[in-house]
């Protein structure tokens, strides 16, 4: 399996026998088979299809505990899957984009609606997974759709309604899909007011 992984992504993006304490905000956890950093949704999809049940997907590692004994699994970190673009009043963001970054891009483009996200320490995927929110705003207020893959690499687009977003919950809590990105709809606003919020 290890040689197969090295064919799917760059050698420097695969850390074998890696301690999870380096990849969680709590700074604890034992070793895993490898931590793998795909650089695109395509690489993430290929890894998902290859590793299936032998893997765990992790974003920023915010509020995640890993047992000191470690895990007999591969960990796919989405931190390098971070393409982001702004078109009209919409932002498209890959799963590994930080919540702070998406809020910053919105502000730079005079778009309001994501101010609440600036202080959330996770990624877009983590934010969608738990319908993250703060300061009277949450993901369900601005998301249009989310993109995901199953463990066979099949892609699916989830509409806002299909996401079943509620307090710290989404449809992804109850299924095995891996979030790859999302589209957010915002509104034009005053840049100075947005930055001051």
Stretches found by the model and what they are:
Residues 15-16, 22, 28, 64, ...:
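Phosphate/pyrophosphate- and phosphate-bearing ligand-binding catalytic cores of soluble enzymes
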Residues 86-88, 127-128, 177-181:
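Acidic/polar active-site rim loop that often engages polyanionic ligands
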Residues 1-124:
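Anion-binding (especially nucleotide phosphate/pyrophosphate-binding) glycine-rich loop
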Residues 105-157:
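Hydrophobic alpha-helical segments and helix pairs
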Residues 36, 76, 93, 146-148, ...:
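Preference for bulky hydrophobic residues occupying beta-strand positions
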Residues 39-41, 68-70, 79-81, 133, ...:
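Short loop segments at secondary-structure junctions
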């Amino acid at each position: 399996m290890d040689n197969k992984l090295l064919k799917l992504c760059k050698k420097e993006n695969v850390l074998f026998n890696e301690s999870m304490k380096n990849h969680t905000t709590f700074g604890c956890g034992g070793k895993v088979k490898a931590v793998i950093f795909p650089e695109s949704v395509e690489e993430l999809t290929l890894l998902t299809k290859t590793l299936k049940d032998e893997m765990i997907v992790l974003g920023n590692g915010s509020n995640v505990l890993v047992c000191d004994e470690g895990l007999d699994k591969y960990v796919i970190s989405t931190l390098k899957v971070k393409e982001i673009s702004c078109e009209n009043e919409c932002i498209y963001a890959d799963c590994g984009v930080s919540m702070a970054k998406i809020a910053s891009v919105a502000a730079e483009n005079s778009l309001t609606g994501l101010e609440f996200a600036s202080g959330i320490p996770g990624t877009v995927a983590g934010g969608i997974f738990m319908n993250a929110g703060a300061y009277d705003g949450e993901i369900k207020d601005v998301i249009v759709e989310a993109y995901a893959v199953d463990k066979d690499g099949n892609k699916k687009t989830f509409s806002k309604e299909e996401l079943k977003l509620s307090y710290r919950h989404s449809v992804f809590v109850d299924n095995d899909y891996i979030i790859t990105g999302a589209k957010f709809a915002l509104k034009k606003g005053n840049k100075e007011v947005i930055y001051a919020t």
